[in-house]
Amino acid sequence: MKKIVLPSIVMLIYSTLFAQHSLEKMWESDSLTLRNPESVLYDSKSNSLYVSSMSSGTIVRMDIDGKVIKKDWITGLTSNKGSALFNGLLYTAETSAVAVIDVDKATIVKRIPIEGAQMLNDVAVDSKGIFYVSDTRAGRVYRIEGDKPSVYLENMPGANGLLTINTDLYVLTSTSFQKVDANKVITKISDGFESGLDGIVMIGENEFVISNFQGILYYVRADGTKQLLLDTRTNRIMSNDISYNSKTKILYVPSFGTNRVIAYKVK
């Protein structure tokens, strides 16, 4: 009897630790409003989405069901991509500057230029209001404190998606997923991905979903184990800078080439 029960227990523990995740498609937005959506950001305060419509230099505001609240919520941006919220302000990356937007007034209040920037991409902010901005073309990450930018990390090929958790900064290069602590000690979490990693969200303790703009979504644990969640490359549906609603477990995925945002339930 013991010889039967013990393997059963082992298999139960194994299946619990390495349970497979899946995505269930909930909705997709229309393809007429957005022009090359590069990034989507969920705002828990307003329970809405801010979508960077890169080719039109605008931010489109949507509800959590993909319906447009305001098409031209913000205009006059230049190749806008990733965004982050802090104290009622939305910070969005342009080509060589970070635009600062007053959310309540829906106006651009200032820009923070970054000298030497080549292609700013994603933005993340920590609890102290210190911002981090990736420069994909230069392979750098900048740090902005008190509106003063400085080079924080270099030699990060294709630096793109950023995420702050406590004192750690998580960084996606083109093919790897890394953690950088407060002393700038770099730990490689997982690598060997196909070139084109883009966005990153945390979906649980030590659990992440990362995107590859070509059209791939991965589930990754902090110990480096990973699982392919979705591959839509054959349908030419891209997966760019993603966002996540932890209460509803909905993942929001902008698709640059098809001009849509697609929502998936994470299971």
Predicted regions span which residues?
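Bacterial Sec-dependent N-terminal signal peptides
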Residues: M1-E24
